[in-house]
Amino acid sequence: MEPVDPSLDPWNHPGSQPTTPCTKCYCKRCCFHCQWCFTTKGLGISYGRKKRRQRHRTPQSSQVHQNSLPKQPLSQARGDPTGPKESKKEVESKAKTDPCA
């Protein structure tokens, strides 16, 4: 370690701050600019206050609109439960006459 002048404040020690100011750029070079840039830009960690988003309240008129919409039919099970069904004999005969097998 290099000897440091005791009369200097810790934040004014040589090498404690980069010569160029921090920017809003998120390129690789700027993300590794200093420790603050690395934690906020590179890692995405910020300890500032988070703004709470306010929900947009729906006016009363839109609630009436919801009631006027026709209700969708309930989703049915996949497949066709009432579709045509082949008998086992027909399937077996097709399997025997299949030239690809």
UniProtKB/Swiss-Prot annotation:
The location annotated for the cross-link Glycyl lysine isopeptide (Lys-Gly) (interchain with G-Cter in ubiquitin) is: 71
Localization annotation: Host nucleus, Host nucleolus; Host cytoplasm; Secreted
GO CC annotations, alphabetized: extracellular region; host cell cytoplasm; host cell nucleolus
Q: Where is this region: Disordered?
A: 48-101
Q: Where is this motif: Cell attachment site?
A: 78-80
Which terms does the record give in the GO molecular function aspect? actinin binding; cyclin binding; metal ion binding; protein domain specific binding; protein serine/threonine phosphatase inhibitor activity; RNA-binding transcription regulator activity; trans-activation response element binding
Region Core, as annotated, extends over: 38-48
Site positions (Essential for Tat translocation through the endosomal membrane) are 11
**PTM per Swiss-Prot/TrEMBL:** Asymmetrical arginine methylation by host PRMT6 seems to diminish the transactivation capacity of Tat and affects the interaction with host CCNT1.
Q: Which Pfam families match?
A: Tat (PF00539)
Binding-site residues, Zn(2+) 2: 25, 27, 30
Q: Where is this region: Interaction with the host capping enzyme RNGTT?
A: 49-86
Subunit organization: Interacts with host CCNT1. Associates with the P-TEFb complex composed at least of Tat, P-TEFb (CDK9 and CCNT1), TAR RNA, RNA Pol II. Recruits the HATs CREBBP, TAF1/TFIID, EP300, PCAF and GCN5L2. Interacts with host KAT5/Tip60; this interaction targets the latter to degradation. Interacts with the host deacetylase SIRT1. Interacts with host capping enzyme RNGTT; this interaction stimulates RNGTT. Binds to host KDR, and to the host integrins ITGAV/ITGB3 and ITGA5/ITGB1. Interacts with host KPNB1/importin beta-1 without previous binding to KPNA1/importin alpha-1. Interacts with EIF2AK2.
Q: What else is known?
A: HIV-1 lineages are divided in three main groups, M (for Major), O (for Outlier), and N (for New, or Non-M, Non-O). The vast majority of strains found worldwide belong to the group M. Group O seems to be endemic to and largely confined to Cameroon and neighboring countries in West Central Africa, where these viruses represent a small minority of HIV-1 strains. The group N is represented by a limited number of isolates from Cameroonian persons. The group M is further subdivided in 9 clades or subtypes (A to D, F to H, J and K).
Q: What is this protein called?
A: Protein Tat
Give the organism, scientific name: Human immunodeficiency virus type 1 group M subtype F1 (isolate VI850)
